[in-house]
C-alpha cells in the first residue's frame, strides 16, 4: 500500500458469508451488510475463511445500491461514527477533507473498490452475481440501521455542494456495476470490461496508481 488510507480502503481482510451449501454473499458497507451480519446467528450462516474464498466455485452474490444515494448515506454514517468515538472534530472540517481527498472510509468508498478487494482474495475466474439492494429481502427481512440516524436535510445539502466533477468519476464507476445487475460475470472479465469499454474512466481512476507501481521491480 502507498499510504495508510490505502490500508483502510483495501484492508488485508475480506468477508464472504455462506448462506447455504452452495450460496454465498459478499456484504458491502451501506448495501445491507449490517442486516446480513445481524441475521447470521439466527439463520446459521457463517463467514467463509479467507483462505477458502478462492476455493468458491459458485457465483458470489453482491448487492448493489445507487451510487449517489450510497455516498450520502456513507458520509452520514462516517460522521456519526467519528462523533461516537469522541473525536473533537467539527462537521465542517470533516466534510472539507472528504470533499478534498474523497475516500477516507469504506462506508462511502466506491462499491467497485470493494470488488477489487474481493478480487485480492478470490481467483480471476471467480464468479459474481450482481443484485439490486431491494432483493436482499429474499435472504433476510431484518432492516438493521446499526444505530445510525437518517441523514438530515442540512447535511445532505452540504454534501451536495461538494465538487462533484471529480467525485462523479467514481460514482460512474459504480454505475458501470449497476449496469451488470442481473448478470453473472468473472471478476477478471469485469475489470477488463471497464478497461475496454470505459477506457478513459479506467485511465483517470487507475492509471496514476499503475504508473507509480510500474517503477517497482
Which role does the model predict for each range below?
Residues 1-21, 184-217:
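Juxtamembrane luminal stem/stalk of type II transmembrane Golgi/ER carbohydrate-processing enzymes
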Residues 27-40, 65-69:
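Catalytic nucleophile-elbow at a beta strand-turn-alpha helix junction centered on a G-D-S/GDSL motif
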Residues 8-16, 48-64, 68-161, 169-172, ...:
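PAPS-dependent sulfotransferase catalytic domain
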Residues 17-29, 127-128:
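Short hydrophobic beta-strand segments
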Residues 38-42, 75-76:
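Short coil/turn segments at secondary-structure boundaries
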Amino acid at each position: 500500500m502507498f499510504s495508510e488510507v490505502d490500508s483502510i480502503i483495501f484492508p488485508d481482510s475480506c468477508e464472504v458469508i455462506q448462506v447455504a451449501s452452495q450460496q454465498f454473499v459478499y456484504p458491502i458497507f451501506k448495501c445491507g451488510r449490517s442486516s446480513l451480519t445481524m441475521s447470521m446467528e439466527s439463520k446459521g450462516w457463517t463467514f467463509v475463511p479467507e483462505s477458502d474464498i478462492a476455493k468458491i466455485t459458485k457465483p458470489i452474490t453482491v448487492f448493489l445500491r445507487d451510487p449517489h444515494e450510497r455516498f450520502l448515506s456513507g458520509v452520514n454514517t462516517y460522521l456519526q461514527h467519528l462523533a461516537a468515538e469522541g473525536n473533537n472534530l467539527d462537521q465542517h472540517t470533516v466534510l472539507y477533507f472528504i470533499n478534498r481527498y474523497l475516500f477516507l472510509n469504506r462506508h462511502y468508498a466506491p462499491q467497485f473498490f470493494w470488488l477489487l478487494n474481493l478480487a485480492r482474495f478470490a481467483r480471476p475466474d471467480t464468479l459474481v452475481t450482481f443484485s439490486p439492494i431491494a432483493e436482499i429481502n429474499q435472504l433476510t427481512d431484518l432492516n438493521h440501521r446499526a444505530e445510525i440516524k437518517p441523514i438530515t436535510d442540512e447535511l445532505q445539502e452540504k454534501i451536495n455542494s461538494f465538487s462533484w466533477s471529480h467525485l462523479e468519476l467514481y460514482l460512474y464507476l459504480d454505475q458501470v456495476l449497476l449496469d451488470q445487475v442481473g448478470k453473472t460475470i468473472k471478476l477478471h472479465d469485469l475489470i477488463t470490461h471497464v478497461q475496454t469499454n470505459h477506457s478513459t474512466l479506467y485511465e483517470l481512476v487507475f492509471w496514476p496508481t499503475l504508473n507509480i507501481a510500474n517503477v517497482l521491480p
